[in-house]
Amino acid sequence: MTTASQTNAAQAPAASGGPGAPKTARGARTRARILKAAEHTFGTLGYHRAGISDITRAAGVAQGTFYTYFAGKEEILRELVRDMGHQVRAHLAAEILDTDNRLEAEERGLRAFLQYLYENPSLYRVLQEAQFVDEAIYRDYYEAFGKGYVRMLANATRKGEIRPGNNEVRVWALMGMSNFLGLRYALWEQDVSFDEIVETLSD
C-alpha cells in the first residue's frame, strides 16, 4: 500500500557528471553540496525564478565550480531529481529490510514514506517543477520506483502472500494512493497521525 515499499529493488544511480564527474572525495562532497543547494533553491524560488547564482550562493561556491560538475540549470534539475529519488528509495529500503511479509512491508513503507516527506517537503516541490521543465525527468522518477515495486510484488505473489494478478496495475494504483496521502497528510495538513493512516488502510 505504499510508494515506500517500491524501494527495495531499486539500485543506486551512478552520478552522471555534466562536464566532469567528481574524481575525488572532496569533489564528490562539493557536488553533493551544490545539489543540496539546488534542492533548497528550486523548492523555495521555483525552477524558472532560480538562477545559477542563487544555487552557488546557497552552496557557498563560485559559479565556475558549478560548471565543473553541471552544464546548466536543466542538467542539475535532472541530476537532483535522480539523486532525490535514489535517496528516498534507499531510505525506504532500509525501513522495510527486516519485514516478514508483504503486508508488513507495505505498512512500514507507507509510514516511513509519509515521515520522510514530512521531513523533506522540497521533494514534491522539485518534482512538480521538473514536470513542467522536462516531463521525462518527472516520469523517470516514478518509473524507477515502479520497476522495483513490481519485482517485489512478483516475489510476494510467488510466496503466496498476495493473489496472482497484474502487478504493474497494482503498483501504479498504490503509488498514486501514497502520492496523494503524502500531499494531504504530510504536506498540506498534518491533522491525522501517520499511524492512524496506516491502520485505516490495513483494516
Residue ranges of model-derived segments:
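C-terminal peripheral helix-coil segments that are non-catalytic and often amphipathic
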Residues: M1-P19, R102, Q115-E119, K147-R158, ...
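Short coil/turn segments at alpha/beta junctions that flank glycine-rich nucleotide-binding fingerprints
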Residues: T44-H48, T99, N120, K159
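Helix-turn-helix
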Residues: R33, T41-E75, E79
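Amphipathic alpha-helical packing segments from all-alpha helical-bundle domains
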Residues: H86-R89, D134-E161, E168-A173, F180, ...
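Short amphipathic alpha-helix in the helical subdomain of ABC transporter nucleotide-binding domains
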Residues: G27-T30, N167-L174, F194-V198
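Short helix-capping/turn signature of helix-turn-helix
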Residues: F70, E129-V133
